[in-house]
Amino acid sequence: MSTDTKQIIADALLKNEQAMYGPFFGSLGVTSAMAFAAAGSAYGTAKAGTGIASMAVARPDLVMKAIIPVVMAGIVAIYGLVVAVIVSGKVEPAGANYTINNAFSQFAGGLVCGLCGLGAGYAIGIAGDAGVRALSQQPRMFVGMILILIFAEVLGLYGMIVALILGAT
């Protein structure tokens, strides 16, 4: 193989590595992180909020204790926001410094954070709704509800950690 042919192949590979659609996937990762995490947070807030509303009729004295699931569901959206802001700062126009590997890493990180946030929000909403309703029947259920909510919240935290590792490369 001649040196001219090798140079043509090397130039073609470099052009593919610095494709013009790279920033699209980086931006899609940013969008995925925020949109899915916010959707999970919204579901968790709504589901836990309806449980609080139904519990407050019988036991209005426990409303401030019962608001914890709503706060924890809101934190899931903050995880998505943190990842979206950090990853968006690393998305660059297509060129020598921004490769497909960077773009796909940012896309994967955003998707991981978003989908973990979606799952965490759903888990917090369902567990929070059941926990708040149980709290109105038996106030000693508070510690058990908090433990279950912490385990659900950690799902979103793990997603954020993995997303920051992927998006930082």
From Swiss-Prot:
Residues 45-66, 128-145 are cytoplasmic. It is a multi-pass membrane protein. CDD domains: ATP-synt_Vo_c_ATP6C_rpt1, ATP-synt_Vo_c_ATP6C_rpt2. GO terms for cellular component: membrane; membrane raft; proton-transporting V-type ATPase, V0 domain. InterPro entries: ATPase_proteolipid_c-like_dom, ATPase_proteolipid_csu, ATPase_proteolipid_su_C_euk, F/V-ATP_Csub_sf. It comes from the Eukaryota. Residues 1-23, 88-106, 167-169 are lumenal. Adult H-shaped excretory cell and rectum. Keywords: Hydrogen ion transport, Ion transport, Membrane, Transmembrane, Transmembrane helix, Transport. Disruption phenotype: RNAi-mediated knockdown causes embryonic lethality. RNAi-mediated knockdown results in increased protein aggregation in the oocytes of sperm-deficient young adult females which is not eliminated by mating. RNAi-mediated knockdown causes hyperfusion of embryonic epidermal cells. RNAi-mediated knockdown results in the accumulation of the aspartic protease hrg-7 in its immature uncleaved form and in the intestine. Causes defects in alae formation in the few surviving larvae and impairs yolk uptake by the oocytes from the pseudoceolomic cavities. It is found in: Membrane. One of its GO terms (molecular function) is proton-transporting ATPase activity, rotational mechanism. The record marks 153 as: Essential for proton translocation. One of its GO terms (biological process) is lysosomal lumen acidification. The chain crosses the membrane at residues 24-44, 67-87, 107-127, 146-166. Pfam families: ATP-synt_C. Belongs to the V-ATPase proteolipid subunit family. Proton-conducting pore forming subunit of the V0 complex of vacuolar(H+)-ATPase (V-ATPase), a multisubunit enzyme composed of a peripheral complex (V1) that hydrolyzes ATP and a membrane integral complex (V0) that translocates protons. V-ATPase is responsible for acidifying and maintaining the pH of intracellular compartments and in some cell types, is targeted to the plasma membrane, where it is responsible for acidifying the extracellular environment. V-ATPase is a heteromultimeric enzyme made up of two complexes: the ATP-hydrolytic V1 complex and the proton translocation V0 complex. The V1 complex consists of three catalytic AB heterodimers that form a heterohexamer, three peripheral stalks each consisting of EG heterodimers, one central rotor including subunits D and F, and the regulatory subunits C and H. The proton translocation complex V0 consists of the proton transport subunit a, a ring of proteolipid subunits c9c'', rotary subunit d, subunits e and f, and the accessory subunits vah-19/Ac45 and vah-20/PRR. This is V-type proton ATPase 16 kDa proteolipid subunit c 1. The lineage of its organism: Eukaryota, Metazoa, Ecdysozoa, Nematoda, Chromadorea.
